[in-house]
Amino acid sequence: MTYPWWSLLPFVAMLACIALLPIIPKTSHWWEKETSQLSVALLLGVPTTIWLFMKAGNGPLISTGVEYVQFIALLFALFVVSGGIHLAGDIKATPRNNTIFLAIGGLLASFIGTTGAAMLLIRPLLETNKERQHRVHTVLFTIFIVANCGGILTPLGDPPLFLGYLHGVPFTWTLTLWKEWLFTLGLLLLTYYSIDRVRYASEDTASIESDDRDVQPLRLHGKINLLFFAIIILSVAFAPSWDGEALAEGHFDSWVDLVPWREVIMFTVAGLSYKLSD
């Protein structure tokens, strides 16, 4: 089924609100309220949902709703488990160390999600660079490398890749993109290292000396969550779940097909992580 071009307008309007309302003086404070954001979402989403239901029936809505639940389950599990890990410590904030931090984050993002990797690394990265005066570029490149470009090697890395996996793209297909991933990551890391060397050279002596004195070894707390990450990865790769299109059409062989085993595992893992983490 095809839809007219103007059916995209509510989505475009939502993106425009997210991008513009926070920076417009007359609407910035209003937009900070969750009730305002919810009002805009309902104003644009409810009429669109009703129109789609009247045009296409409940099949596409059920199928899309199933995908949404599957996506939220993965995001929720990764968010909770990554929140249970704390990488503590404070090493020297040299360009070399910062670049290694970002490189590790760019790799981890493919396996624990861009959100999970960013949550795990941003705190020790900020702690490491707290003595430096020039650190904004480090946060920006963390967003570029860890929270964006890094998560491309598995469907867990980024939401569009996971949605593609739900639509039949093989779990290991994204590994074929390793050359593109390596090129992009290498280019960003080289750019960051060059910028950070210049900014590091412009730091005053007092900041560098303070950074050299305040050094603590890195320590990983909540190690049990590494096991939970492994369980999530295995569940995405091997555990069965709902087939949205089959459910929408009423096609299933037994009650087993009605149980979202993958999501059950994810929510269970998230609950265990919440209970067992430090």
Go through the PLM ranges and name each one.
Residues 134, 154, 163, 172-216, ...:
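Juxtamembrane and boundary regions of transmembrane helices in multi-pass small-molecule transporters
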Residues 10-25, 41-52, 70-85, 122-126, ...:
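Central hydrophobic cores of alpha-helical transmembrane segments in multi-pass inner-membrane proteins
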Residues 1-7, 11, 17, 42-47, ...:
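Intrinsically disordered, low-complexity non-transmembrane regions of multi-pass membrane transporters
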Residues 96-150:
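Hydrophobic transmembrane alpha-helices that form the pore/transport pathway of multi-pass ion
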Residues 113-118, 137-169, 189-194:
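Alpha-helical transmembrane segments and, especially, the helix-loop junctions at the ends
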Residues 23-27, 47-67, 79-94, 107-120:
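Transmembrane alpha-helix boundary signature
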Residues 1-7, 29-39, 58-70, 171-181, ...:
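Interfacial loop-to-helix junctions that mark the boundaries of transmembrane helices
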Residues 229-278:
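Transmembrane helical segments that form the transport core of multi-pass membrane transport proteins
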